[in-house]
Swiss-Prot record:
Family, per entry: Belongs to the protamine P1 family.
Keywords linked to the UniProt accession: Chromosome, Developmental protein, Differentiation, DNA condensation, DNA-binding, Nucleosome core, Nucleus, Spermatogenesis
Organism of derivation: Sarcophilus harrisii
Region span, Disordered: 1-62
Location, primary (coarse class): nucleus
Gene name of the record: PRM1
GO CC aspect terms: nucleosome; nucleus
Protein's UniProt name: Sperm protamine P1
């Protein structure tokens, strides 16, 4: 069990590092969140493009 715990800790640390880097770019994160809200209105125009992009990244994240 000790080995497993060590592995999980290293994994969580790498995740936190990625999140911290994104937070430092705070502006980008906010724009992404806003675009998701307005994506419903623009879905009619860019159906294939927005769906492919957000379905792959958005679903895995959230």
């Amino acid at each position: 069990m000790a080995r497993y715990r060590r592995r999980s800790r290293s994994r969580s640390r790498s995740r936190y590092r990625r999140r911290r880097r994104r937070r430092s770019r705070g502006r980008r994160r906010r724009t992404y969140r806003r675009s998701r809200r307005h994506s419903r209105r623009r879905r009619g125009r860019r159906r294939g493009y927005s769906r492919r992009r957000y379905s792959r990244r958005g679903r895995r994240r959230y």
